Amino acid sequence: MDNYFVKPDFILEKFEFKESFKIPSIKDINAESVVDLYENMRPFFPYFQDNSQTTIVAPKLEDILDNFDALLLDAFGVLNSGSALVPGIIATLDKAREKGITLLVVTNGASNNSFIKRDQLSALGLEFSQDEIISSREAAEIFLTYNKPNGPLGVMGNMGNDFIIPDLDCIELEQDFSIFEEVNSFVLLGTIQWDTVWQDILCDSLKNNPRLLFVANPDIVAPHKSNFSIEPAYFVSHLISNGVNLPFWLGKPFPTIYELAMNRITELSGRHIPLSRIGMVGDTLHTDILGANSFGIKSVLMTKYGLFRNENVAKMIKKTGIIPDFIIEGP
């Protein structure tokens, strides 16, 4: 397996969206506009795809458990929808454990560490050990440990006291342009407190002095019960549109987090599990499904509680050409 933790060099590149494409405003965000934005980002997303020749459609995840020895589980849209638990998920995961299936939560949420994510899921009634959760925050930490940029590194999005890169000076940024100018690279973990001031300072700083930008979370939105939260990739798309160099992405669908997940699956199961027996269960074609297809594991699209709830899923698949191995409604 290739080692995606190590990148021999970093090259700053620009990208121009098609002149006819306009990034949707936040008030106009819906499933279709999210797919359109992802599609316009496809040139710098993983490009290899071993599309399924036969997509299996089933009502529930529990109906297809016998196809897997390990399952990677997205959080939003699979385990929870905002602060609400996805109905039936606890019983299905209990059945999976009874069958000896190794479970691993793989989330693009990078604002918090795995301890906090474990506690958040536990509050909903879902019990995972800390080792059964991998976030793109962790992927960023490991990738940057192997590939240290010239310091200091400016951190945006809840650095806390636990985001540590050995032998690299990490500085939690504030809304002060002069501080941005003092760092040699940036990592964007989350955008919970993001606003136009943050956006303008980062954009102006990177245009004035191009430097590396690492983005831990490639999600455009996250599904909640009745709306979507706006996630880092949406704001980064505006940076790209304004002439900032392309960032280096570290979450799904990009391979670093999947390699980290494969290593963790081996540790948890105590054995080598063939890629054909590992499934990624997610709600989004361009992150969960594209990432799984590109990495060579099986992809499972859950449609009822995430991005595509109340949407014509077949239309979205035809539009994108991203074909899951399995399509299910819920757990």
Regions found by a protein language model. Name each.
Residues 102-106:
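Short glycine-rich or small-residue beta-strand-to-loop segments that form or flank ligand, phosphate
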Residues 109:
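Conserved phosphate/oxyanion-binding catalytic-loop motifs
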Residues 2-101, 112-134, 141-331:
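Asp-based, Mg2+/Mn2+-dependent phosphohydrolase catalytic module
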